[in-house]
A protein has these predicted regions:
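Helix-loop "lid/cap" segments that line or gate small-molecule binding pockets
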Residues: 24-25, 45-60, 112, 146
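Short helix-capping segments at alpha-helix termini
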Residues: 27-31, 57-61, 117-121, 150-151
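Asp-based, Mg2+/Mn2+-dependent phosphohydrolase catalytic module
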Residues: 88, 92, 105-218
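Conserved SAM-binding loop
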Residues: 10, 98-101, 158-159
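Short, acidic loop-to-helix structural element flanking the phosphoryl-transfer center
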Residues: 75-100, 106-110
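Hydrophobic alpha-helical core bundles mediating ligand binding, dimerization, or RNAP-core interactions
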Residues: 17, 21, 25, 50, ...
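Metal-dependent phosphoesterase signature
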Residues: 31, 51-89
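Active-site neighborhood of HAD-like aspartate-dependent phosphohydrolases
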Residues: 1-39
Length: 218
């Protein structure tokens, strides 16, 4: 089975998402630039990010902050989000089981895939970190997806674009392919993904098929 992260892998959302989150932080009086959000929180659950910001700042975010961010994100995604280049091509040849496992909420996963016409490849196999106790880099989400799909972790390949996501896949006992083809990917991201445990790194989703064959012989 192939397990895909959503943001930054299937949809080119990371730059848009960090811009939205940063804007809402600044409106709430917290000076977090998009670069800071991307550097420290890419791949993390929003709830974990908000909790860490409150601890670091020594004060609470507004009580409706999570809802404000979620509402702004869904609106902008419906209007602006695009699929990662060649995502549909890469998915079209995958005949075996596949799913999405994302740190995002169920609503955001669904909106992301509907807006980019990728949901047809996955529904109903959409898994959110909201379903588990611990988000990435803990393995809980990937193990939950494998258990629900009735596939052994050792038979799973994870496609991830963040070091915390790669670490989660490795901790789950899965083979991880790093992806650096999103518009947010910096020059050192590939090295960071390898350091976190990715067995291979690709910059074009058209290379996914040959990479899986090289790693697993599928």
């Amino acid at each position: 089975m192939v397990i895909f992260d959503c943001n930054g892998v299937l949809v080119d959302s990371e730059a848009l998402s960090t811009s939205i989150v940063s804007q809402e932080f600044i409106r709430a009086g917290f000076a977090l630039t998009p670069d800071i959000v991307a550097r420290y929180f890419t791949g993390r659950r929003p709830s974990d990010m908000f909790a860490e910001v409150e601890i670091a700042a020594g004060r609470k975010l507004p009580s409706d902050f999570a809802l404000t961010v979620a509402t702004a994100t869904l609106r902008r995604f419906r209007e602006e989000l695009r699929a990662t280049k060649h995502a549909a091509y890469a998915l079209s040849w995958l005949r075996g089981p596949k799913c999405v496992a994302s740190s995002s909420s169920h609503d955001r996963i669904r909106v992301s895939l509907e807006a980019t016409d990728l949901i047809r490849f996955f529904e109903p196999n959409l898994f959110s970190a909201a379903d588990v106790q611990h988000g990435k880099p803990a393995p809980d989400l990937f193990l939950h997806a494998a258990r629900t799909m009735r596939v052994e972790p050792s038979e799973c390949i994870v496609v991830e674009d963040s070091p915390v996501g790669v670490a989660a896949g490795v901790a789950a006992g899965m083979t991880v392919i790093g992806f650096v083809g999103g518009s947010h990917a910096g020059g050192q991201l590939g090295n960071h993904l390898r350091t976190s445990g990715a067995k291979a790194v690709i910059s074009d989703l058209r290379a996914l098929k040959s990479t899986i064959i090289d790693l697993r012989g599928w």
